Curated annotation (Swiss-Prot):
Modified sites of kind Glutamine amide: Q25
Disulfide bonds: C7-C19
Recorded GO MF terms: cytokine activity
Keyword NADP: no
Top-level taxon of origin: Eukaryota
Classification via InterPro entries: GBP_PSP
UniProt cross-references to Pfam families, sorted A to Z: GBP_PSP
Protein name from the UniProt record: Growth-blocking peptide
Length: 25
């Protein structure tokens, strides 16, 4: 799933190219 190189709203892209929820910080 590629959203212009980004992720779904509320998610961030990790260095390995995956997406993680920003609230896991």
């Amino acid at each position: 799933e590629n959203f212009s190189g980004g992720c779904v709203a509320g998610y961030m892209r990790t260095p390995d190219g995956r997406c993680k929820p920003t609230f896991y910080q």
